[in-house]
Each structure stands twice: as C-alpha cells, then as structure tokens.
A protein has these predicted regions:
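Active-site acidic/histidine proton-transfer and metal-coordination neighborhood
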Residues: 4, 8-94, 102-105, 114
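Histidine-acidic metal/acid-base catalytic patches
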Residues: 23, 34, 78, 82-96, ...
Length: 196
C-alpha cells in the first residue's frame, strides 16, 4: 500500500477512526501506523487504557488524535477529552469533528478555542442548519451551511494550527467529487483571504 501510494505521489499521514477495548489490538494498530510511517492515528481510546495508549504513542512516535463522535462517546465534548489527557503528553490531542459538535448543540468556535494547541487533526466540514422534524444535519458544500468555515479557519490560524484537515463530506454519495472540489475551492479562497 505504501509503495502504491508513493507511486501516485500520495503520503498516508494517518488512519482511523480506531476503537477497541482490547490492549493487544492497540499495540497492533500502533505497529501498523509505525510501519507505514504515519504521523497519527485517529481513535477513541477507552478511558481505562489511556496509560497504555500514551505509552504506545511514545514507543512508536505516533500521535493520538481523539475523535469526538456524538453521545454516548466519552469524547463528545472537548472538556471530556481535556480531562482524559490532562497532564499527559502533548502528542495526545483532538481529531476535531466540527460538525458533530454543532449536531450535539455545542458551538464549534468555542470548542476549537477550548482545545487550543491540542488539535492534531480535523474532520472538517460544513453542515445544513437544523430543520424541524429532522434529527441529522447533512454535510453541505463548505461556505453554504451553518458552521462559519472562514471563522473556524481564522481561529485555527490564530492558534498556529499545524495539523491536518480531512475533508469529510458524507453526502451525495454517488457523485460527491464535484461537491468536494467546491469545498476545496472555498477553502483555498477563504485561506487566501485570511492570510492577507
């Protein structure tokens, strides 16, 4: 896989979202990430395995980027993650899914600010506004939804964010590439404006 990725000019920097309560599986996950020369794994460690996960992170030189799936995930809000990693290595941090925060009634700007310097990667997106009678807010083309993509990018710039963006677009499954291209175009335009 690494050879094929390299042949195509692609560098695989991370994997996930990894979830397991089996300590041996965590060792194998870190081994895989190390063998593939990845920088981080995206995961949701059980609260009672943090000592092992931190130890494996140090052993293999792999960062841990914790995803915030909606409730009942232990990490659905930033305070929970910050409590779990308090006093631990700076290589343990957040894979901030900005859409899930909003879907849970949290303000994504506040969450990004709260996690200052502990964000390793992002599942970045824009989502449709809440609609009466609908529980789920669909992913939409960046800049057309309710998340203030440009504002989030400004917060990340203020924080000196140096991690990774994963474009997460879980909509229009049969023809999503044109929508993703529009997301990239919006990102480039917004980033250019912010950097002026």
């Amino acid at each position: 896989l690494c050879a094929e990725a390299a042949r195509r000019g692609v560098r695989i920097v991370g994997t996930g979202v990894y979830v397991s309560d089996n300590p041996q599986e965590w060792e194998r996950m870190f081994q895989l990430a190390h063998e593939m020369k990845m920088e981080y794994i995206t995961c949701e460690p059980p609260l009672d395995l943090w000592d092992q996960v931190e130890s494996l992170s140090r052993k293999y030189g792999i960062k841990v980027s914790v995803h915030n799936h909606p409730q009942p995930s232990d990490y659905w809000k930033p305070e929970n993650l910050l409590e779990a990693i308090k006093g631990r290595s700076r290589d343990l941090g957040s894979c901030s899914d900005v859409g899930h925060w909003n879907r849970e009634g949290l303000q994504q700007m506040d969450c990004l600010r709260m996690l200052n310097k502990r964000i390793i990667s992002l599942h970045f997106k824009d989502i449709a506004p809440k609609q009466e009678g609908k529980q789920w807010q669909e992913d939409v083309i960046w800049g057309t939804g309710c998340l203030d993509v440009k504002g989030m990018l400004s917060v990340l710039k203020e924080q000196g964010f140096k991690g990774y963006f994963a474009i997460e677009y879980e909509n229009n499954w049969d023809n999503s590439v044109p929508d993703i291209v529009k997301c990239i175009e919006y990102f480039n335009q917004a980033a250019e404006e912010i950097l002026r």
